[in-house]
Amino acid sequence: MYQHHNWQGALLDYPVSKVVCVGSNYAKHIKEMGSAVPEEPVLFIKPETALCDLRQPLAIPSDFGSVHHEVELAVLIGATLRQATEEHVRKAIAGYGVALDLTLRDVQGKMKKAGQPWEKAKAFDNSCPLSGFIPAAEFTGDPQNTTLSLSVNGEQRQQGTTADMIHKIVPLIAYMSKFFTLKAGDVVLTGTPDGVGPLQSGDELTVTFDGHSLTTRVL
């Protein structure tokens, strides 16, 4: 069972709960998906059962078509946020990590075409592999100007920087809190840069953010 932990692997005293995500938050990714830039952030939720440890081998579905990787900056919430100001958001951020928003792309395409919600494509079991978190007070970089990259079998597929986000981290979380109360232990995913693509059994992935790297593989 997944538990929040720091980058070194020590358990953190936060409950595991929901993941609130934003789609279409990088212009180049929007272009590669053939989508239009939304007027407001596109939000969706992954349940607790979507979370798994990025350090462990990834179990992906085999019965629903292609499974795509999307590397994202993850934000750990450390206090309740409801109708929050940006000042409250800054104080409530407990840490930063990196996550994969695994996506059943064929399923998502059908649901988009039918005008239906994305949950089946985005919120399935183990769809959110998550790293350990670096405490906000110890994060030496700028979370809003942090590099993100993902390589598969030594080939770089995704490379971006959080500086390119359309909706920046703090105002984005404040916006989320207008609709969903965020509690300590909740995680926010902030969108993916371009270069998303399919995963296959046996693939080895290296995920990097702000100079920190993790390697995992697909079962």
UniProtKB/Swiss-Prot annotation:
InterPro entries: Fumarylacetoacetase-like_C, Fumarylacetoacetase_C_sf. Its EC number is 5.3.2.2. Its cofactor is a divalent metal cation. Pfam families: FAA_hydrolase (PF01557). Mg(2+) binds at residues 70, 72, 101. The keyword Metal-binding applies. Keywords: Isomerase, Metal-binding. Disruption phenotype: Metabolic defects, characterized by a significant increase in acetate and other metabolites associated with anaerobic respiration. It comes from the Bacteria. GO terms for molecular function: acetylpyruvate hydrolase activity; metal ion binding; oxaloacetate tautomerase activity. One of its GO terms (biological process) is oxaloacetate metabolic process. Coiled coil: none annotated. The keyword DNA damage does not apply. It is an enzyme of class 5 (isomerase). It catalyses: oxaloacetate = enol-oxaloacetate. Belongs to the FAH family. Tautomerase that converts enol-oxaloacetate to the keto form of oxaloacetate. This is Oxaloacetate tautomerase YcgM. The lineage of its organism: Bacteria, Pseudomonadati, Pseudomonadota, Gammaproteobacteria, Enterobacterales.
